[in-house]
Structure formats: structure tokens, C-alpha cells
UniProtKB/Swiss-Prot annotation:
Chain intervals for the UniProt region annotation (3-dehydroquinase): 1054-1267
Catalytic center residues: 258 (proton acceptor), 273 (proton acceptor), 819 (for epsp synthase activity), 1170 (proton acceptor), 1198 (schiff-base intermediate with substrate)
HAMAP family: EPSP_synth (MF_00210), Pentafunct_AroM (MF_03143), Shikimate_kinase (MF_00109)
Region feature EPSP synthase, mapped onto this chain: 395-837
Catalytic activity: 7-phospho-2-dehydro-3-deoxy-D-arabino-heptonate = 3-dehydroquinate + phosphate; 3-dehydroquinate = 3-dehydroshikimate + H2O; shikimate + NADP(+) = 3-dehydroshikimate + NADPH + H(+); shikimate + ATP = 3-phosphoshikimate + ADP + H(+)
Entry protein name: Pentafunctional AROM polypeptide
Region (3-dehydroquinate synthase): 1-382
UniProt xrefs under InterPro entries: 3-dehydroquinate_DH_AS, Aldolase_TIM, Aminoacid_DH-like_N_sf, DHQ_synth_AroB, DHQS/DOIS_N, DHQS_C, DHquinase_I, Enolpyruvate_Tfrase_dom
SUPFAM superfamilies (UniProt xref): Aldolase, Aminoacid dehydrogenase-like, N-terminal domain, Dehydroquinate synthase-like, EPT/RTPC-like, NAD(P)-binding Rossmann-fold domains, P-loop containing nucleoside triphosphate hydrolases
Keyword flag Zinc: yes
A GO-annotated cellular component: cytoplasm
Length: 1569
């Protein structure tokens, strides 16, 4: 018997030739022979990308060489980097130059192996090389197979947009080998499905239906692992590809050069390409087209040429392939780092579309699934496009007079959701008509499908949904059911998933939603189900989603008690699932009168339609008996229109005096809201005609609506928003009650109406269960809002205010336009088409958007835990002081409430157990009542109580902050041994700590490890490291913003094995840097405890933000590449300790990157990639994948390559420039190696630097910050500035020595000069010079110069003198910068005093007193300095009492100034005088009476242990008479004036340059050391 011949490949004809060949296995089994036979040449050039070469080219080469043996032909190969970035003029030129170097001629055949990028660009090379050579397409992606490889369009991208330079150049062959799809990444496969969906949507509804039905199976196979993953869908894929390719071939054959018909293939592309042009390369072509299809379908619906059901069907199909349907899709936002697509830019991009007719934009409009409105793209005006693209809409008031319209609202949301649940639980097929096509029902439909509860298909152009129910046979889902903000779906499905049986992959199902859903209540339903044996676990906030529901296989049944006063949906949820319980159910509603009884009645009525009859108890109120059974699906179920939605068109009629008819809602409706016309509109003055099945309303003349003294809207609570906007324009007061449940809907709707109506000048009062609206009908009417109406992402708020906008005096902006999609996606279309309302899209100000998107600062209260003696109370007080919050020590609060001490409580009858119970009760109380704006210090043993631990863990998980305070255990032990104020430990202290250590860890999400001992420092003075920590964790740090605004910024990379051993180096090496990098991978000990200590020490020493880096071996570091668990533990530590920056390598596993980025709090992620081997080039697209990945996860992107030559640095600069033009995310990009030094000089933003004092450099070619500044100066990138000292006499001043020394040390090219003058006119020209960098000012110009500056600091204003001039901000058009006058004398004094141990005084009765000697200009600075340290009173000792009194009068009373002029005044001085500052000249004798007064005060015996310090402001002679008096008195430390000169100049340098040098260097320069 003859062997059956295997069928050959499928051939598709295009332009009269069968040149498209489709099959599995073509590449190695067919292509070589076919090429040699049908496309012979002397030279084949195979061009592919670096990703594909190794997999597909070597085997092909071997086959080719074997087949071509003896023939005069050769095969050349060339690779380019993958990705859209390669589709450029530069890459095209690179290929052409290479081909010329290979002596390719006119007979060359080019083979493009790859995706759309490869085919587009290589086709263009073929079209222009030697004026056109033959080429062959071998598409390897689904998108290329069905779209870009067919039709001869070739092009490259330009900065203006995609594919704008190219040619029509038909390939000689297109080999579509479906085997390539086996290795195609999941995202690329899904990307291609967009073009498949597009082709079916414009051409063939039958194929579209196949796509709908195949989506789940296709995705399951595509996402599976292993060889042969696509085998189960082999035939489906072949059908899809042949179908799509065939359509395109047919269209191209009819219209090769895109004269009209071929336009249709661009459905979704007009808007999609514009989106792609902005979001490329992070967003793929198919993803952009998917979004474009949705928008263009919405456009067709808005224009009235496409029915809403078709739009919903298209959106559902696109989403079913996991493609995005909106630019706000979470994945799109993440991939593109939230990059905006401004409407004006989108329209500009659309303006260069090749389909356009001059200025007229042409867009493909669908008229149905599988059919287009015209056989070409249609002209659409910009105003309409803008409306569809904009996030907000501007509604112009007014409708035509005598309007009489009929409006059919979408299907009822309430009935639609119930029908879907009942049909899915029922057995058999059910045709559901008039189903609401909305976000809510889409979530419900997707969830039921995910649970395997039913299959479904669309009929009658998407107007009928056919549900095939499986009789309640549901399976638990491994993937969470995401329900957005669909409250109805969440409540119904909570009970439905309890009916699930365990599946192979899951024994429970998680229900989750968006942020609002996670605060909406569901507690009563969960309580009822738990009481009936269903295991449900809250995954986040108690009483809200997300929930984990056990696959219980049904309820136990019997009696179920349910609180139904919040939502009737809880009742309906249990009612609908009850027939599948293991026993008959009696549902008893408790807690008071059930809310929204009509909706409960609706559910019972619908259950009867599906074959299950519920009976109300005859002897118990609010009790129902539900039998066991199985729903039997009716063959057809028609959903009546949504009565809540119907209130909006009826209200427009009411408010405008026109007529509107709703043809399918009348008095026999199942819905309570159907009564709105009769119960609300009629009493307000409307004419209402309601039959059994229709409602017609005619409004009174505009302005004649009457308010309702009282209306109970409990039967129709959702309609209260519509009533409220009508009440706003009515005369008199309207009181609406019975709507308490509206506070827990999509938003607090009562508060929302009150706040938004206020924008129209309407006053409202909130009631316990309602709202009171004071109508403006008799007061001249409502006023027009000056700002947009905020809709809270709530469909009913948006639609209600669109009604009011029609009656506004001027246009009204309604924000969040798309939120109406929840129940009436086509609402704006109805306003435009039926009511003829004029509207246009509106885009909020971009800056306002940016403000909204900023991460919020910490608002939730902080609970501090840790061992007694760790410093919780001290840290709590510090934190409260910094944040302006209230501090409460819970131990003290417990004692206050109990009226006895803790030791007394423990010794009492209830003992430790009673104490712990009261402690727990207090914790619960403050968590509930004081969840914001408080700092609580908890008792050390609180964590011993399991329930307390759970409370703390839950609090931390739900956005709260639990801070663990710890310090060296030995210090804690030593302190506790001395503390007698608390109960003694019954077990050894260390054992207690070790027992609690893990508890502290698990309960806290923040950690502060104090490097300060209990005895060190002032408890009133907040240490710098703690300030830095709180600033970071609270979101108040502006460091990133500050360094982004600087021209040049740096972080120094520490390369020390132990920070504590290098403690003396740290202050020196951080000079000139903006942050310090802790290379954790270089530490000797990387244990969590050790790293905790190292971070703590570094923060205290460096006083700079920390970059926490764990560099792996493969990225040039020392951390093991695959030590993932150890690495994750260290990353978690970094986040707990509030590291300002955490470096995360983009080569780490996805789960680690996700974990770190999602729990980062306010830490900034530096998403990094290093190429220490130098395998990648900045010239091509090889860095793009790493850039894109870093963009997804990073606040900062860091890319580091290797330079082989200087050219590599220029290539890098071009790459960086292109990326920064496209994205705002800041970027560090450099090359390693000697040749890469230039890139470090040019980087500018947070450049990693070394320091000569460090043991070695962190990377090859690393430079110091000073070296880079010198390099910048040589390149002309850092302009030299001139700084001056103004005054007279100044020839002996040490200021030039100070500043020029510091300029030299920090690498700055500036010079500091003396300008000796006593005339202010001499300095004016200098102050205006473009190269003026700053000035020091001394006598006699400190007052005169105040008139020459633009603004004064608070210190300069208070002191009344300027000693420092600082240019601020950017130069204006005349190259002049604004000048700030400041005074650093006081800061110099404070520094000198602090250096001698003077601490900030606690704000208490015990704070120290201080004295200033003298009454001149310097005295004022001394007073300011002492006040800043908290001293009070401050005495002024001077010989002239009148001058003293005048001086004191210039300062606020809070300074507590008191004058002393006679020796007898010494008796007025308090005994705790600890600080004296002398401001009198030292080169002349002291006034005798003043000397006697000062001598008497200095000679007093010391009180307490505080240090006594005398600061002498004069520095000639070196030992002054006042200093001599102090020496003679004894017990005084004297500080000479040169110390102040050094420190005030040190502060000046910091103000001018932003660099804080070492004080010892400034001091040495002044003292000439």
C-alpha cells in the first residue's frame, strides 16, 4: 500500500502570487531548498538579532552549506541588538556600510529573520540598497506573522514618530514557520494577539467569536512551561495565523499602496501609534494598538455608529488575552514608570499619521464586530477625539428647547449581576438580553469564568450573552479574583466561592480589589459565613477585602443569622448560594430593619425565575426559608434597564423643562429606584406619566422646581444623588433621609455631595442618615464652579453632576470621565446624541497631576516597641517634636487611667495577668481612637501577649508604622540594673531579651538602632542620625529633589570592611558628597545584627543619606550571585532602617525585585545594571532591555558599562540624552575603566566617587569628587566664580586663607579676594557681576549691604546685620541671580559653644541662663545665638542702660532679655548662669563698673554639673581682659574669638557651595596650622 503523502505547507496568495507560505517546521525543512530553487542569487544576507542568532542561525547555516555545495552562492550573516531602538537611521546605515564592505551587489537577497522591527527595517534596507534588492521575510513573532511581514510596508522610526521614513517594498517570499512561536516569550505572544483581534474585529465576526472562545485555552498553553507547550493549540494557532494573514493579503492585493481599503488594517493604530510614540520602547506595539482599539471603538460609539454592546465585547476580548485596555492599566503604568500621555501630544502625534488628509485626521470606525463603518478610514474632528482621549470633560450648559427624547438606559447593574450568578449556578443554557456592559459585570463575568462555573458566548452582534451553567460545579482558583471597585460582585462572590470544590492547584480563593475596595465593609457577611462553617481569612484590613475563602463545597446550612442594616447585598449573596448548602437554610436578618428591602425582594423574585422558590417565615419577621435545589436556567432572561441610571436622563428633563421617556421601566419594575419619578420628581413639580412598563417626565420651566421638605429615599438610596442635584436648583430646603448606607459605597457619597455642591454655592447639612440641601432656586440660582468637580471614581457622582452642569451658568468640568463605565459606559454619548449637550475633553494641569502623584508623607500613628531602657520614651519625644505630633507613653497612660503605678497593679489581686490584660485593652483603644498624628511608646513586655503581637502586625501590614527601638544589649542591661522605677525582672535580663527578640522583629516594620548610650548626649537635643531616620521613614526627606536640582551631585563609595574601625575616616571621606554608599558586599561580617550596627554607626558619623548596596560578583562586587535569601534579608533590613536609597540589581529574580520595591516605603530604589565585562555597547539597543526593566522598578536608574576608548563615552552621552528626553526618571550612566573617566565627569547626577583616604576604589576608573570638579572646570562645565570680603580694615583678615584653602581641597575653581572699602558704592558693581559667587561682609558695611540684596534670612532680619551675601536660584535673562543676605556670626558662636559641650536647653523651668557683655552690633548676633540654644533669661551687661533698654526692645518678649549696668545688678541674675559671650572691644580697658559686675558674676560658685563657658568674640589680643577675669574666677572654660571666625566662615562656605568641609580644615586655615 502506498504511503500517504504528507500535505504540503499552506500557501496564501498576495498580489497574484502565492508567496506567503505557512506551516510548522519550515525554517529547517523547507526554506533552504525553496530559496535556492525559487530565489537564486550569488549572495544571501541573513540578518537577525542577537537573541535569535544562536538558536536559529547555526543549524540553518549548516543546512545551507550542505545544500549549496558546488553552487556559486554564499550566505553572509549579521546581527543587531533586539528591540524598537534598533529601528533607526543609525542601524540602517551600519548594515548598509557592512554590506558594501562585503561587496554585496544588485543580485543580493536579504533575509530578515525576526519580529516586526527586523522586517520593517531590513525591508527598508532592501528597498534602498543598490536602489532595491530582493528580500525575504521570516517572521518569528506572532505579530510579524499576521501583520508586519505582509504587505510590503518597510520603515524606520524617527524622533517625530514611528515608521515615518520608509518605502513600499514587497518581499519575494514570506515564510511563516509556526514552530518559532514555541520559543516566543509570553508577553511577545500576547503582543501579537492584538493584531489578530484587530483583523477579526474589522473583517470577520465568526473568527472573532473563535478568538473569544479560545482565549482561556490559548493563554493557558502560552503560559505553561516546557517543550511542546503550544502542541494542544497547534490547529487553533494555524487557523488564527492563516485567517489573519489571509485577510491582510486580500486587503493588500486590493489596495497595495493604501489608497483606502488598506486603511482598515490600521484600526486601533491611529490612536495606538500616538500612544506608542510616547511610551515606546517600554510599551510594545500590540499593547499600544490594544489600547488604541478600545479608544477608537469608544469614538465610534460616541459618534453613534457602534452599539455599546459591541464596544464591551471588543474590550472583553482584548482583556481576555491579557492585553491592556487603558493607558491607566496597572501594568502599563508600571512598565512606563507612570509616564503621562498628554492629549495635546497625542493629537500632535496623530497629526503626522500617513492616513490623514492634510489637517483632517482619519480613523477607522467600526459599525459592528467584523464590520467597518466605511470601506476606508473616516474623517473625525479634533474636538471629538479630544473628548474620548481626555480624563475629564467640560460640559456646556443648555439643551435645545422643546426637546422630547426617548432614552433606553443599559441593563440594571443589580439585575445583571444577579442574573450572571444565577445562570452560572444554574444548569443549562440561558440567553441573557440587555445585560449591562460595564466594569462591574465584566469583573463578575471574568470571576465566574475563572472559577469554571460557566462558559459563555455572544450572539446577535454582542447584544445577547449565552451562558452555559454547570449547575454549581465550581473550582477554587489559584489566581486571585480581582474585582476593582465592584462592590456588588465582591459581596455576591464571597458566598459563591464558598461553594467551590478544591482544585488541583488551589484549596481556597482570594478575592481582592482596588484601594477603595479594601476599605469597603464586608464584615457582617463574613461573620455570617464563618458561623456557618466557612473558613474565611482577612488578608489585610479587618472587615474588608482582600479575603481568602476556603473551598468549602457549600455552606453547612441550617439557621444563618445576618446583620442586614448596612447592605442588602449581604442578604442577596447568601440567598442566591443557599440552595447549594448541605442542608436547607433558614436566613434570619438581625440587628434592626433591613436596608433596601426592595433589593431583597428582587433577588427572591429572580430566584423564582430560575426555579428556586424562597418563602418568608409566617411567624418570624425578616426570616426566609430557602430549600435545597439546583437552579434550572430559563431559555431566555431579559434584564430590564437600570432604574438608578434612568434617574439621570429623567433629571435632565426635570432640570431643563424638557421631556424624556424611559420605554422599559414602569410601575411593575423589580427595582426600587423605579419609584423615583413618582415619589421625587412629581412632588418637585414635574409632570410624570408612568405605566406598567414605561415612564415619561416633563420638567417645569427652568428655575421652577420645588424643594421637598422631607423625602425618605430608603427604598431607592442610590438615587439620592440625583435628587440632591435637583434640590440644589429647587426653591426651598430639601431633606433626604434613609440613606445612611451611602456613606460606605464607592465613596462617602453624602460627604461627596455636600463638598461638591458647595462648589456651586449650595449649602448642605449632613444628617445622621441623610442630607439637607438648601436650594438656590429663589436666590438667583447656583453659581458656576471655579474648579473641576471631583468624582471620587464614583459613577453616580459623575453622572449626577453632569445633570447639574446642564443647568450651570457656565461650563463645568467633571473629572474622572471614565468612571461612568461602571454602570453606563455610553452616558456621555447619550448626553451628546440624545440631549444635544455640547461637550469637549479637558485635561487637568500637568503640574496638578504631579502634585497629586507625590507619595504621601506619614500620617498614621507610630507605635514604638523595644526593651525597657532602649530609649523608647526619649526617641518618642524626639519624633513627636519633629513631626509636630502628640507623644503618649502607654505605661504612663495606663497608670493615669488606673490611678496607681504599674508595680502597684502587679502587686494587686489581678497580678501580672491583669496588668497584661489592661495593657492590651489600652493598645486596642488607642489604635481605634488615635490612629493618626500620635507617637505611642509601648511597654517592653507588650509583645509577650499573643493578641497584642497580632494587633501590631496587622497595624503594620495595613499601612501603620511599628518602630522597634534598640541599642547595644550590654548598655540596656547596665541601665536596667540601675532602674528602680519599674518591676524587677524575674529572670535574667539577657534571657528576657532573647525571648522577645523575634517577637520585636515580627511585630515591627521599622527599626532604629541607636548608636548613642543612655548617658550620652542631651535628651532634649535630637541627634542628627535620628533626624535623618525620621525624615526618611516619614516621607519628609527632600534629598532626591534637592540633588536633582543641583548641577552636580555625588555619593562616595565606602570600601571599608568595618565601618566602626574606619570611624575616624568617615567624616573626611564624605566631604563634598551628597550621600554615602555602604557597600554591604565588602563588609567582613554581613550578618543582620552586624550590618544593623554598621548602618547605625555610619549614619551617626557621616550625617548623610545612605545608599545601601549589595553588589553581586557578576556585577563587579563580592556578594555571591545566588545567595538570594541572604540578600533579601539584608534588603528587608535596609528598608526597615529607612535607608534613603537602596540599590537593587535588575538581574535579580523577579520575586526579590518585586518584594523589595513593593515594601520600600519611602526609600528610593536605584535600579542598577553593571556590565563589568564590557559585552554591551551604548551605540546600539543592547542596553534598552535593562533600561526598560530599571524604569519599571526604579526611582533612579543606574547603568554602568566599560569604555574601551573615548568614543564609548560619547555614545553613552547620546544614549543618556535620548532616554532623558523620553523619561523623567533620573539616571546615573557611566563607563568603568581609565577610558571611562570622562563619563564620570559628564554624569553630573549622583556620580559614585572615591576618596584618597579610602583603602581602594569601588570600581575601575573611579575618581574623587574633587578630581571630577577639576575636570568639569577644565571642560568649561563648572564656571570659576569670584568671592569677596567687603569692609575696612581687612588686610589682616584670615578669611581669604580659609576660603581659598577650602576651594582648593574640594576641587572648585573659585577665588576669594579682599575688597577693602568703607563705601557701599564700591561693591555694587561686584554684586551684579555674572561671575559673583558670594561675599563676606564686615564692618562698617554690615548694615549698608542690607539695601543691596533681594531678600534677607530670618537671622539677618532679627540681628539687623548681614555678614554673608549668597546668590540664589538660576540666573535671569540678564545673567543676574537673586541675592540673599544672611548672618552666620550667630552660627559660628553656636558651633564654638557646642564644641565646648554646651547643649541645647530643654524647654523647662530648669533651663540655663546666659549673658552677653556689650551692646553693639555683635551683641545682637550673640543674643540670637543664645536664644537658638534655648537659654533664658538672657542678660545684657553694658555700661549704658539706655542702649541696653533700646536693644532689648528690638527683640520679642520670648527672648527674656534683662539689662545689667551696675555692680549691684548682679543680685538680679539667676544662679544657673552657665554661658557668657563677650562682644566688647579687647584693645581698650573695660569700664570699671562693668568689669566689677562681670567679675562678680564670673566668680560665683558653679551650680550643678553643667559646664560654664565664656566665649570671647575679640581675637586680638589672643588673651583678653574678660578671658583673664574668667581664668581668675576659675571653673570657666574660655573660647577665643578665632574659633568663631573659623566656624562662621565654615558656614559661609557651605551656603555658597553646598559642600560641608571638615571643620578642622577650616580651623587650621584660620589659625595657620
Amino acid at each position: 500500500m502506498a504511503e500517504a503523502k504528507k500535505p504540503g505547507p499552506e500557501r496564501i496568495s498576495i498580489l497574484g502570487e502565492a508567496n506567503i507560505i505557512v506551516d510548522h517546521g519550515l525554517w529547517l525543512n523547507f526554506v533552504v531548498d525553496d530559496l535556492l530553487q525559487n530565489t537564486p542569487t550569488s549572495t544571501y544576507v541573513l540578518i537577525t538579532d542577537t537573541n535569535l542568532f544562536d538558536t536559529y542561525v547555526p543549524a540553518f547555516q549548516a543546512q545551507f552549506e550542505a545544500a549549496a555545495e558546488g553552487k556559486a552562492t554564499r550566505l553572509l550573516t549579521y546581527t543587531i541588538p533586539p528591540g524598537e531602538a534598533s529601528k533607526s537611521r543609525e542601524t540602517k546605515a551600519e548594515i548598509e556600510d557592512w554590506m558594501l564592505s562585503q561587496q554585496c551587489t544588485r543580485d543580493t537577497v536579504i533575509i530578515a529573520l525576526g519580529g516586526g522591527v527586523m522586517g520593517d527595517m531590513i525591508g527598508y534596507v532592501a528597498a534602498t540598497f543598490m536602489r532595491g534588492v530582493r528580500f525575504v521575510q521570516v517572521p518569528t513573532t506572532l505579530l510579524a506573522m499576521v501583520d508586519s511581514s505582509i504587505g510590503g510596508k518597510t520603515a524606520i522610526d524617527t524622533p517625530m514618530g514611528k515608521n515615518l521614513v520608509g518605502a513600499f517594498w514587497q518581499p519575494k517570499r514570506i515564510y511563516i514557520d509556526l514552530a518559532f512561536l514555541e520559543t516566543l516569550p509570553v508577553r511577545e505572544f500576547i503582543n501579537g494577539m492584538a493584531e489578530v483581534v484587530k483583523t477579526a474585529a474589522i473583517w470577520n465576526e465568526t473568527e472573532f467569536t473563535v478568538l473569544e472562545e479560545s482565549a482561556a485555552h490559548i493563554l493557558e498553553c502560552v503560559r505553561s512551561k516546557g517543550e511542546g507547550r503550544l502542541t494542544p493549540i497547534k490547529d487553533v494557532l494555524k487557523r488564527i495565523v492563516i485567517g489573519s494573514a489571509g485577510v491582510k493579503a486580500e486587503v493588500v492585493s486590493s489596495d497595495e499602496r493604501e489608497g483606502g481599503l488598506r486603511n482598515l488594517l490600521n484600526f486601533g493604530h491611529s490612536i495606538g501609534h500616538a500612544i506608542e510614540a510616547i511610551l515606546t520602547p517600554q510599551l510594545l506595539h500590540g499593547e499600544a494598538v490594544a489600547i488604541g482599539m478600545v479608544k477608537e471603538a469608544e469614538l465610534a460609539r460616541y459618534l453613534g455608529v457602534l452599539r455599546p454592546g459591541a464596544v464591551a465585547r471588543l474590550v472583553k476580548c482584548i482583556a481576555s488575552y491579557d492585553l491592556p485596555t487603558s493607558i491607566h492599566d496597572k501594568r502599563v503604568v508600571k512598565l512606563t514608570a507612570g509616564k503621562k500621555c498628554p492629549v495635546d501630544v497625542l493629537l500632535q502625534k496623530m497629526g503626522v499619521d500617513k492616513k490623514n488628509d492634510g489637517q483632517k485626521k482619519k480613523i477607522v470606525l467600526l459599525s459592528a464586530i467584523g464590520k467597518c463603518h466605511e470601506p476606508r478610514a473616516s474623517v473625525v474632528d479634533d474636538k471629538t477625539i479630544r473628548t474620548i482621549l481626555s480624563p475629564s470633560i467640560q460640559v456646556t450648559p443648555g439643551v435645545p428647547s422643546n426637546l422630547d427624547v426617548t432614552v433606553t438606559p443599559p441593563g440594571s447593574k443589580s439585575i445583571s449581576n444577579r442574573a450572571l450568578v444565577l445562570a452560572a449556578l444554574g444548569l443549562g443554557s440561558c440567553r441573557i438580553k440587555n445585560l449591562l456592559h460595564s466594569d462591574d459585570t465584566e469583573y463578575m463575568l471574568s470571576a465566574i469564568h475563572q472559577l469554571g462555573g460557566a462558559s459563555y458566548s455572544w450572539q446577535d452582534a454582542g447584544e445577547v450573552l449565552v451562558v452555559d451553567g454547570k449547575g454549581g460545579n465550581l473550582q477554587a482558583s489559584k489566581e486571585a479574583l480581582y474585582l476593582g471597585n465592584a462592590g456588588t460582585a465582591s459581596r455576591f462572590l464571597t458566598t459563591v466561592v464558598a461553594l467551590c470544590s478544591p482544585s488541583e492547584s488551589a484549596s481556597s480563593t482570594i478575592l481582592t480589589g482596588n484601594a477603595r475596595m479594601k476599605v469597603r465593609p464586608i464584615g457582617p457577611l463574613v461573620d455570617a459565613l464563618r458561623s456557618n462553617g466557612v473558613e474565611i481569612e482577612y488578608q489585610g484590613k479587618e472587615n474588608s477585602l482582600p479575603l481568602r475563602v476556603d473551598a468549602a463545597g457549600g455552606l453547612k446550612g441550617g439557621v444563618i443569622e445576618l446583620a442586614a442594616t448596612v447592605s442588602s447585598q449581604y442578604v442577596s449573596s447568601i440567598l442566591m448560594a443557599a440552595p447549594y448548602a448541605k442542608n436547607p437554610v433558614t436566613l434570619r436578618l438581625v440587628g434592626g430593619k433591613p436596608i433596601s428591602q426592595p433589593y431583597i425582594d428582587m433577588t427572591i423574585s429572580m430566584m423564582a425565575s430560575f426555579g428556586v422558590h424562597v418563602t418568608a417565615s409566617s411567624d418570624e419577621p425578616n426570616t426566609y426559608h430557602i430549600p435545597q435545589g439546583q437552579y434550572q436556567n430559563p431559555s431566555e432572561y431579559i434584564i430590564e434597564s437600570d432604574a438608578s441610571s434612568a434617574t439621570y436622563p429623567l433629571a435632565i428633563a426635570a432640570i431643563t423643562g424638557t421631556t424624556c421617556t424611559i420605554p422599559n421601566i414602569g410601575s411593575k419594575s423589580l427595582q426600587g429606584d423605579a419609584r423615583f419619578a413618582v415619589d421625587v420628581l412629581q412632588p418637585m413639580g414635574c409632570t410624570v406619566n408612568q405605566s406598567d412598563y414605561s415612564t415619561t417626565v416633563t420638567g417645569p420651566a427652568p428655575g421652577e422646581l420645588k424643594g421637598l421638605p422631607h423625602v425618605d429615599m430608603e427604598p431607592m438610596t442610590d438615587a439620592f444623588l440625583t435628587a440632591s442635584v435637583l434640590a440644589a436648583v429647587a426653591s426651598g430646603k430639601t431633606q433626604i433621609t434613609g440613606i445612611a448606607n451611602q456613606r460606605v459605597k464607592e465613596c462617602n457619597r453624602i460627604a461627596a455631595m455636600k463638598d461638591q455642591l458647595a462648589k456651586f454655592g449650595v449649602q448642605c447639612n449632613e444628617l445622621d442618615d441623610g442630607i439637607e440641601v438648601l436650594g438656590k432656586g429663589q436666590d438667583g440660582g447656583i453659581s458656576a464652579p471655579t474648579v473641576g468637580i471631583h468624582c471620587y471614581d464614583d459613577h453616580r457622582v459623575a453622572m449626577s453632576f453632569s445633570v447639574l452642569a446642564v443647568a450651570s451658568p457656565s461650563p463645568v468640568i467633571v473629572t474622572e470621565r471614565e468612571c461612568v463605565g461602571k454602570t453606563w459606559p455610553g452616558w456621555w454619548d447619550i448626553l451628546s446624541q440624545a440631549f444635544k449637550v455640547d461637550m469637549i475633553g479637558h485635561e487637568p494641569d500637568a503640574n496638578a497631576d504631579e502634585e497629586d502623584s507625590k507619595s504621601s508623607v506619614m500620617e498614621r500613628s507610630v507605635f514604638i516597641i523595644g526593651m525597657r531602657g532602649a530609649g523608647k520614651t526619649t526617641a518618642g519625644n524626639w519624633m513627636a517634636k519633629m513631626l509636630g505630633w502628640k507623644f503618649i507613653d502607654l505605661d504612663q497612660e495606663l497608670e493615669r487611667r488606673a490611678g496607681c503605678t504599674i508595680p502597684e497593679m502587679i502587686r494587686g489581686s489581678r497580678g501580672w495577668e491583669g496588668f497584661r490584660a489592661d495593657e492590651l485593652s489600652l493598645l486596642k483603644d488607642v489604635m481605634a481612637k488615635n490612629s493618626h498624628g500620635h507617637i505611642f511608646s509601648c511597654g517592653g513586655g507588650l509583645v509577650e501577649t499573643p493578641e497584642a503581637r497580632q494587633l501590631l502586625k496587622d497595624y503594620g501590614r495595613n499601612g501603620g508604622n511599628v518602630l522597634l527601638i534598640h541599642r547595644d544589649t550590654e548598655q540596656v542591661v547596665e541601665y536596667l540594673m540601675r532602674d528602680k522605677t519599674r518591676p524587677a525582672y524575674t529572670s535574667e535580663i539577657r534571657e528576657v531579651y532573647l525571648r522577645r527578640k523575634d517577637f520585636y522583629q515580627e511585630c515591627s516594620n521599622l527599626l532604629y538602632y541607636s548608636p548613642h548610650s543612655e548617658s550620652s548626649g542631651s535628651k532634649s537635643e535630637i541627634p542628627c542620625d535620628f533626624q535623618q531616620f525620621v525624615s526618611s521613614i516619614s516621607g519628609r526627606s527632600t534629598h532626591l529633589k534637592d540633588v536633582m536640582e543641583k548641577d552636580h551631585s555625588f555619593f562616595v563609595s565606602l570600601t571599608v570592611p568595618d565601618v566602626s574601625e574606619a570611624a575616624s575616616l568617615i567624616p573626611e571621606v564624605v566631604v563634598g558628597s551628597d550621600a554615602v554608599e555602604l557597600r554591604v558586599d565588602l563588609l567582613q561580617d554581613r550578618s543582620v545584627d552586624s550590618v544593623t550596627r554598621q548602618v547605625s554607626i555610619l549614619r551617626a558619623l557621616a550625617k548623610k543619606p545612605i545608599v545601601f548596596t549589595l553588589r553581586t560578583v557578576s556585577q563587579g562586587g563580592k556578594f555571591p550571585d545566588e545567595a538570594y535569601e541572604e540578600g533579601l534579608e539584608l534588603y528587608r533590613l535596609a528598608l526597615r532602617m529607612g535607608m534613603e536609597y537602596v540599590d537593587v540589581e535588575m538581574t535579580l529574580p523577579e520575586n526579590i525585585i518585586q518584594t523589595v520595591t513593593e515594601s520600600r516605603g519611602h526609600s528610593r530604589i536605584i535600579a542598577s545594571h553593571h556590565d563589568p565585562q564590557g559585552t554591551m555597547s551604548w551605540k546600539n539597543a543592547s542596553w534598552i532591555p535593562f533600561y526598560n526593566r530599571a524604569l519599571q522598578f526604579g526611582d533612579i536608574i543606574k547603568l554602568v558599562g566599560v569604555a574601551r576608548s573615548s568614543e564609548d563615552n560619547f555614545d553613552l552621552a547620546k544614549f543618556k540624552s535620548r532616554m532623558q528626553e523620553a523619561q523623567k526618571t533620573p539616571m546615573i550612566a557611566m563607563n568603568m575603566g581609565k577610558a571611562g573617566k570622562l563619563s564620570r565627569v559628564l554624569n553630573k547626577f549622583l556620580t559614585p566617587v572615591s576618596h584618597p583616604a579610602l583603602p581602594f576604589k569601588a570600581a575601575p576608573g573611579q575618581m574623587s569628587a574633587a578630581e571630577i570638579r577639576r575636570g568639569l572646570a577644565l571642560l568649561g562645565d563648572l564656571d570659576p566664580c569670584n568671592f569677596y570680603l567687603f569692609g575696612k580694615p581687612i588686610s589682616a583678615s584670615r578669611s581669604p586663607a580659609l576660603h581659598n584653602t577650602l576651594f582648593g581641597q574640594t576641587g572648585l575653581p573659585h577665588q576669594y579676594h579682599r575688597l577693602e572699602t568703607d563705601n557701599i558704592q564700591d561693591v555694587r558693581e561686584v554684586l551684579q557681576a555674572p561671575d559673583f559667587g558670594g561675599a563676606s561682609v564686615t564692618i562698617p558695611l554690615k548694615l549698608d549691604v542690607m539695601g543691596q540684596v533681594d531678600e534677607l534670612s530670618e537671622a539677618a532680619r532679627t540681628i539687623g546685620a548681614v555678614n554673608t551675601v549668597v546668590p540664589i536660584g538660576k540666573a535671569d535673562a540678564s545673567d543676574r541671580r537673586r541675592l540673599l543676605g544672611d548672618n552666620t556670626d550667630w552660627r559660628g558662636m553656636v558651633h564654638a559653644l557646642r564644641d565646648e559641650g554646651v547643649e541645647e536647653q530643654a524647654d523647662s523651668e530648669t533651663k540655663g541662663a546666659a549673658m552677653v557683655v556689650g551692646s553693639g552690633g555683635t551683641t545682637r548676633a550673640a543674643i540670637f545665638a543664645l536664644h537658638s540654644l534655648g537659654f533664658g533669661p538672657i542678660y545684657i551687661a553694658a555700661r549704658n542702660q539706655a542702649k541696653v533698654d533700646a536693644l532689648a526692645a528690638d527683640f520679642p518678649a520670648e527672648y527674656q532679655l534683662q539689662g545689667l549696668s551696675q555692680p549691684s545688678d548682679a543680685d538680679k541674675v539667676s544662679s544657673n548662669l552657665n554661658v557668657v559671650i563677650s562682644t566688647i572691644p579687647a584693645d581698650r580697658p573695660i569700664d570699671p563698673s562693668l568689669q566689677e559686675l562681670v567679675g562678680a558674676l564670673l566668680s560665683r560658685p558653679a551650680v550643678g554639673t553643667e559646664r560654664r563657658v565664656l566665649l570671647e568674640m575679640a581675637y586680638k589680643p589672643s588673651h583678653t581682659p574678660i578671658m583673664q577675669l574668667a581664668d581668675e574666677a576659675g571653673n570657666w572654660t574660655t573660647v577665643p574669638g578665632l574659633e568663631v571666625l573659623a566656624s562662621q566662615g565654615w558656614y559661609q562656605f557651605e551656603l555658597w557651595t553646598g559642600i560641608t568641609p571638615l571643620y578642622r580644615d577650616a580651623r587650621s586655615a584660620v589659625l595657620g596650622l
